[in-house]
Amino acid sequence: MDDKSYYEEIESILRQILQPIEKISFSTFIRVVSGYKIIPIDLSKKEDKELINDLAKACNEVIEEIKKTGGVKTKEGKTPKRVNEVGNHIEHYVKDVLNKYGYAITPKTKKGKQKSTGYPDIEFWYKGKKERDGRVVYIEIKTFNEKNINSSHRTFYASPSKDEEGVKIRYDAPHLCLSFKIEKLGRDYYATGFKIIDLSKLKGGIKREFNASNRELYKKDLIIYEKDLK
């Protein structure tokens, strides 16, 4: 193979690799990036039905707790400035309530280090009082409203960790999304409903992208002209 054919083949392969992947199951994605399986929920099983019933009770309690605080508040008691921040601040309500039904923590990596960023939001030991006590369930917190529930915009993200030690999944387990319906009343945001979603059945896409940091973008050898008005 001559150099021209070689580079043409490399370019062709890269072009195919960089194409978005459509309709991949979340279960497959999680198994590839973590090595662990998503266990589907089967409501014909007593233990699964009991789990979902208790999570539904917990979601109702979260809604009531939000009412008591006069809408969703940060841990410091402030109202989120933007609606897309609300989901982040519902998490502490959810953790507090889930601790009545088990043991809820920020997920740990394989090295045992807690990591708040990335998927999933919560590692929940159902009916347990500590780690490895009870049944483990991974939980992601989301929000929605009547206007955006049928939107085609991407709202659910999970990215592979740069290294295997950064993955926040350590067990085969159910993966559930607790999504709260949000309505704005005055300046405050209230939860007025919820959905419990079995992520084992979710299908989505993988979109590759090129990215660079500011440090990489603004290197001196890249800049061909600049001006700074002082």
Curated annotation (Swiss-Prot):
Signal peptide: none annotated. It catalyses: Endonucleolytic cleavage of DNA to give specific double-stranded fragments with terminal 5'-phosphates. It is an enzyme of class 3 (hydrolase). GO terms for molecular function: DNA binding; type II site-specific deoxyribonuclease activity. Its EC number is 3.1.21.4. A P subtype restriction enzyme that recognizes the double-stranded sequence 5'-GTAC-3'; the cleavage site is unknown. It comes from Methanocaldococcus jannaschii (strain ATCC 43067 / DSM 2661 / JAL-1 / JCM 10045 / NBRC 100440). One of its GO terms (biological process) is DNA restriction-modification system. Keywords: DNA-binding, Endonuclease, Hydrolase, Nuclease, Restriction system. It comes from the Archaea. This is Type II restriction enzyme MjaV.
